[in-house]
Amino acid sequence: MVAAPNHSFCLFPTAIGSCAIAWSDRGVTSVWLPEQTDSHTRARVFRRFPHSIESAPLPFVSHAIEGIVALLEGEARHLTDIPLDWGESVPEFHRRVYDVTRTIKPGTTLSYGEVAKRVGEPDAARAVGQALGRNPIPIIVPCHRVLAADGGTGGFSAPGGTATKLQLLAIEGARLL
């Protein structure tokens, strides 16, 4: 018996290449930044959600796509109104980190330590970095806006690593710390 799909996804073109977005009926569950090819991007989707189906986006997903496309074209979009579905696999601490990270406006940055303070765990800068390294919804949860205290980029787990992080910050006109 084949498992019923609980996620849908689609690819969409942006200024930096084809991104992918997955969703449930409750909200966006994942965003993937461009891989080398659309086939590689699809393969990443299926690694995370093996039973997902590619389909036309629901209205809230179309709204998310429009926001991501605009942001990646340099428009200062704050994507806090997009519903998210964390499912049951995202730990509570990570959710708190993601909630704080969503408040960082385009063109601005915070340090890992500043995010830790805002989640009420001032000594948890490394744990913040680990949570952001597992962020399943980049751009909507703008982990690229969180930097090391010394002004360095810190890490970035999306394709292209820190070069992609710097590209996203440049698109937004952000100044490094």
What do these predicted regions represent?
Residues 1-122, 171-177:
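Basic nucleic-acid-binding alpha-helical/helix-turn surface characteristic of O6-alkylguanine DNA
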Residues 43, 126, 166:
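Active-site phosphate/pyrophosphate- and oxyanion-stabilizing loops and adjacent acidic/basic residues
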Residues 124-135:
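Regulatory, non-catalytic segments
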Residues 140:
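Major-groove DNA-recognition helix of helix-turn-helix-type DNA-binding domains
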Residues 143:
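Short cysteine clusters
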Residues 149-177:
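…primarily DNA-binding HTH/wHTH and HhH modules…
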